[in-house]
A protein has these predicted regions:
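N-terminal beta1-alpha1 cap of cysteine-dependent amidohydrolase-like domains
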Residues: 2-8, 13, 24-25, 29, ...
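Short linear segments in intrinsically disordered or otherwise low-structure-confidence regions
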Residues: 16-18
Length: 393
């Protein structure tokens, strides 16, 4: 036992001095060995004890830390009844002056949109589904304005919408021209009366309202842009505010002038020179963009009315996202963003309309009451069209 090795030497019996000396020497060695062993044993035991306590403390400290964190988190969570204010007031209400269920009227065009492959009825008219999807993608619904239905019915439907879209096509005469002219004048009258009633005129729509405003059916010039994608070149000192381009991100605006993101599908247009010389056009519109055709000739491509929410496009913003019949249509992410921003502007303008028609009358006339026809298998033209004939009116 350690107590034996550390006992006093006087308790050990001796016989003679020499033996005592030997015993003393031997005892000294034994004491040194005992002290060394004791020190080693004590050091080892202390080390193991320290390690044992470390292993015991680590999980305890982790557990304690978690409990403290949880307690702190719980102390920062308040029930609505514990707050002095109503938590529902955190969501600001939408602007009451805006209409969050806007409806756009799209005017149908003579024919079936497929050169008679779908319907050769003389009373047939159509709306390409890409225009419908274009409007719906921005948060509005569509009522078809069937151009050859009775006038009173057509204008009753016009009273149900918050904006109008004139589509592309080919017809520039007869009943169709007359209906476009009457609707265009009605749009201006509604705006003059205080309603904010937007119009998008795309391709043929651009051409028709140019003819109507100038009262000149020969105002159009020939261009070679029947199937191509192009850039848009913005005019000098162009002010974005209040135009279709006002919410475009700066990088996308830049790409519009460097990348071919605008689909062209037309043979007619107006040169910048002719536009400037025509006082009717220059007084009504400002030029936002121009383009070059395949022969490097410039034509006006985007117009914005000075005093009305009227925008005219001599290019096709709807095709990038919703038409697949031509390989020249751009489908890049940037091209899709162009389509979306242009659609968003039309619907944002329509939300400002004061017109609040009967909800039931709107439901009775929505394009959901008709079914589109798939015609994309032909590999050209539109992918889908809505066809209207006398039997469906």
């Amino acid at each position: 036992m350690p107590s034996h090795f550390l006992s006093n030497s006087s308790s050990i019996p001796t016989s003679n001095p020499s033996d005592s000396a030997i015993a003393a020497g031997s005892g000294s060695d034994s004491q040194n060995d005992a002290l060394s062993l004791t020190s080693s044993f004590s050091s080892s035991s202390a080390s193991r004890l320290s390690e044992m306590w470390s292993y015991m403390w680590i999980p305890f400290l982790i557990s304690l830390s978690k409990e403290l964190s949880l307690a702190k988190a719980q102390s920062e969570i308040f029930l609505p009844t514990e707050l002095e204010r109503d938590s529902s007031s955190r969501c600001s209400p939408p602007e009451s002056r805006l209409n969050y269920q806007p409806v756009i009227g799209i005017l149908s065009h003579p024919g079936d949109g497929a050169s008679g492959r779908l319907s050769n009825a003389s009373t047939a008219s159509y709306i390409a589904a890409s225009y419908v999807k274009f409007v719906e993608s921005a948060g509005a619904r569509v009522i078809p304005l069937i151009y050859n239905e009775p006038t009173d019915i057509l204008f009753q439907k016009l009273d149900l919408v918050n904006g109008v879209l004139f589509t592309g096509g080919w017809c520039k005469s007869g009943l169709y021209y007359e209906v476009v002219e009457r609707i265009f004048k009605k749009i201006l009258e509604r705006n003059d009366a205080g309603d904010h009633f937007p119009l998008y005129a795309i391709c043929l729509g651009f051409e028709l309202i140019s003819m109507i405003i100038t009262k000149d059916r020969r105002i159009l010039e020939r261009f070679n842009a029947a199937d191509m994608a192009s850039t848009l070149q913005f005019t000098k000192d162009f002010n974005l505010e209040g135009t279709v381009f006002q919410r475009f991100p700066p990088d996308l605006l830049k790409k519009l002038s460097t990348d071919c993101l605008a689909m062209q599908k037309h043979r007619y247009g107006i040169s910048p020179e002719k536009f400037q010389k025509n006082q009717y056009l220059s007084r009504f519109f400002q030029v936002l963009t121009t383009c070059k055709d395949e022969d490097d000739k410039d034509y006006v491509s985007t117009l914005q009315a000075h005093n009305y929410p009227v925008t005219a496009f001599q290019w096709h913003p709807e095709k990038n996202s919703f038409e697949w019949g031509y390989p020249t249509i751009p489908h890049t992410e940037d091209a899709i963003q162009v389509t979306q921003h242009v659609a968003n502007f039309l619907v944002s303008e329509a939300r400002k309309s004061l017109n609040r028609p009967s909800p039931q009358k709107v439901l009775d006339n929505l394009i959901y009451n008709y079914s589109p026809t798939y015609c994309g298998k032909a590999g050209r033209g539109y992918d889908e069209v809505y066809i209207f004939t006398r039997s469906s009116l």
